[in-house]
């Protein structure tokens, strides 16, 4: 179930960052970022994901204040989380 405070893919910031809830539907192959192969890039291993906000498959993201992103998502700002 999608939480009411989840980022929608039509959100202006989401559009600008090419965010998709399902990384497999994103442009991550064409716009892959350094750190991991494109197929391994998703919100769950991104430095912008906020692990203490949200629950289940949904977490906070510093790029979308006050909203939740899907851990299986991807956006063009993906950056490998340290550690």
From Swiss-Prot:
Q: Which GO terms describe its molecular function?
A: 4 iron, 4 sulfur cluster binding; electron transfer activity; metal ion binding
Which keywords does this chain's UniProt record carry? 4Fe-4S, Electron transport, Iron, Iron-sulfur, Metal-binding, Periplasm, Transport
| Coiled-coil residue spans | none
Entry GO terms, CC: periplasmic space
For this chain, the annotated S-S bridges are: none
> From what superkingdom does this record's organism come?
Bacteria
Please give the chief subcellular localization of this protein: periplasm
Q: Which InterPro entries match?
A: High_potential_FeS_prot, HIPIP_sf
For this protein, the record's PROSITE patterns field holds:
HIPIP (PS51373)
The cellular location(s) given in this protein's UniProt record come to: Periplasm
User: Which one GO biological process term can you cite for this protein?
Assistant: aerobic electron transport chain
Sequence positions that bind [4Fe-4S] cluster: 43, 46, 61, 75
Family under the similarity heading: Belongs to the high-potential iron-sulfur protein (HiPIP) family.
Self-association state and partner proteins as the record states: Homodimer.
**What is the documented function of this protein?**
Specific class of high-redox-potential 4Fe-4S ferredoxins. Functions in anaerobic electron transport in most purple and in some other photosynthetic bacteria and in at least one genus (Paracoccus) of halophilic, denitrifying bacteria.
Provide the protein name.
High-potential iron-sulfur protein
Native source species: Isochromatium buderi (Chromatium buderi)
